[in-house]
Regions:
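C-terminal beta-strand-rich structural cap/linker in extracellular carbohydrate-active enzymes
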Residues: 126-146
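Hydrophobic beta-strand residues in large extracellular and virion-surface proteins
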Residues: 81, 95, 107, 114, ...
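Short loop/turn positions at the edges of beta-strands in beta-sheet-rich folds
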Residues: 87, 99, 111, 136-138
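Active-site-proximal substrate-binding groove within the catalytic cores of carbohydrate-active enzymes
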Residues: 1-106
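A general secondary-structure boundary signal
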Residues: 90, 116-119, 129
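Short beta-strand element of the conserved SAM-dependent methyltransferase core
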Residues: 59, 95, 122, 140-145
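Beta-strand-rich binding/interaction modules
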Residues: 102-122
Length: 146
């Protein structure tokens, strides 16, 4: 007689540190996600909550509306800038580092006042640009007043 199978086993793993947000960051850079879902085989506890919380706070600070890539908005090609325009509430920028390395980039912006979308703090600007340093696969969101 055949031995009974002992059940089902699965192992879910994630990349270490900021690299744990690679899938989410690339989805944000290349599309218009309005939800984030995970396919896991068991309970899902993130090993690097600092990066997950930072990403989620910035993701949730953006309106769930279509965005478009702003060509050449960042001085570094690995930084993708997506823009969401509204009729009444200004615009939002989603700035994503798609690189495996930390990056510093100048971001072009046509607004007169730019604020961090998560906390409302002003982002210093010079001549229609601001400088931003991002760790690998980091998302930062900004609101532009009009």
């Amino acid at each position: 007689a055949e031995k009974e199978k002992l059940g089902y086993s699965i192992c879910d793993v994630e990349h270490a540190g900021p690299y744990c947000m690679m899938a989410e960051a690339l989805a944000m850079a290349n599309g218009n996600p309005t939800m984030i879902g995970y396919l896991t085989g068991t309970n899902f506890g993130r090993g690097f909550p600092k990066y997950v919380r930072e990403f989620n706070a910035n993701f949730l600070a953006l309106p769930a509306m279509p965005s478009s890539i702003v060509p050449n908005a960042a001085s570094d090609a690995a930084i993708v800038v997506r823009r969401i325009d509204t009729e009444k509430d200004g615009s939002w920028l989603a700035v994503v580092n798609t690189s495996m390395e930390p990056k510093t980039s100048r971001i072009k912006c046509d607004g007169t006042e730019v604020k961090h979308a998560v906390n409302g703090k002003p982002q210093p600007m010079t001549n229609g640009q601001f400088e931003l340093t991002l760790y690998p696969f980091q998302l930062k969101s900004f609101h532009i007043d009009r």
